[in-house]
Amino acid sequence: MPQTPPQHVTALAQRAASLCLDFKANDVTLLDLRPVSDMTDYFLIASGTSDTHVRSMAEHVMEELRREGTRVVHVEGLEQGRWVLLDYVDFVIHLFHPTLRQFYQLERLWSDAEVIAVDRQGALK
């Protein structure tokens, strides 16, 4: 699989964040994992207000990114909607029900990663 240029990966992660915000996601956070992990470049973490909201947000992100030419490689948790993982290889999206996000605290687990907050336009702050 060809490697995606770093600036394109960043733009895709920002676009995914913007799509989550379009769907009224809460606490949208982008973690830059490049200095601390070879697994992926970014984690995008966001919360929905209910299982239905989380599922709908995941479907919205997948559909919009697919229309723009980026296909998800692996999906987990879509049926339940409590924690949906969308793996795009260079970035991974974690969409949580708030109680599970609080329980797993991925931001704490990856505390060595740079935390990049995202504003309503999807631009990095």
Question: Locations of the language-model features?
Answer:
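Long, contiguous binding/interaction regions
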Residues: 1-35, 52, 56, 63, ...
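Short hydrophobic/aromatic beta-strand micro-patches
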Residues: 45-47
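Active-site phosphate-binding and catalytic loops of NTP-dependent enzymes
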Residues: 67-75
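Active-site beta-strand termini and strand-to-loop segments that position acidic
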Residues: 86-88
